């Protein structure tokens, strides 16, 4: 699972998901891509599940580029804790995704294989996605 090696601060504000993606929205590395159409937080587990799905479906010859990184810590308090006494401890990491952001890029396989992989990965993501090709 992906997570930063070191951060300047342990905890972050929640923030808001508004606007569209202005960076990371063009195909650079591969021939095909999966693009987000809605704002969402994508966990490191979801990113890894998508990567494993793509490599499993396409078998040999595929090259996958993960175009997002989970760099936002999400904190949680345990269930039996009373209110107050500060913010909880970081439990997992998410990537903040805005509409238009590329999630994965693929290359080295025919379009029908890449399209099938993208369709199955879309079920594992928490937002609507679409398939792009150059």
Curated annotation (Swiss-Prot):
Q: What is any one GO biological process for this UniProt entry?
A: mitochondrial translation
Q: Pfam families, per this entry? A: Ribosomal_L16
The cross-references to InterPro entries, in alphabetical order and at most eight, read: Ribosomal_uL16, Ribosomal_uL16_bact-type, Ribosomal_uL16_CS, Ribosomal_uL16_dom, Ribosomal_uL16_sf
Its keywords, alphabetically, are: Chloroplast, Plastid, Ribonucleoprotein, Ribosomal protein
GO terms assigned for molecular function: rRNA binding; structural constituent of ribosome
Oligomer and partners: Part of the 50S ribosomal subunit.
Spell out the PANTHER family in the cross-references.
50S/60S RIBOSOMAL PROTEIN L16, LARGE RIBOSOMAL SUBUNIT PROTEIN UL16M
Name-wise, this protein is: Large ribosomal subunit protein uL16c
**Species annotation:** Welwitschia mirabilis (Tree tumbo)
Q: Which gene encodes it?
A: rpl16
């Amino acid at each position: 699972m992906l997570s930063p090696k070191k951060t300047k601060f342990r905890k972050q504000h929640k923030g808001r998901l508004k606007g569209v993606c202005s960076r990371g929205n063009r195909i650079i590395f591969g021939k095909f891509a999966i693009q987000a159409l809605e704002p969402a937080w994508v966990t490191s587990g979801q990113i890894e599940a998508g990567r494993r799905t793509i490599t499993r479906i396409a078998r040999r010859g595929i090259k996958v580029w993960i175009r997002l990184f989970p760099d936002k810590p999400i904190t949680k308090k345990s269930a039996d804790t009373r209110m107050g006494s500060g913010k909880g401890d970081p439990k997992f990491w998410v990537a903040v995704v805005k509409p238009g952001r590329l999630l994965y890029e693929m290359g080295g396989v025919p379009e029908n294989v890449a399209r099938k992989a993208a369709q199955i990965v879309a079920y594992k993501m928490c937002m609507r996605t679409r398939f792009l090709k150059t």
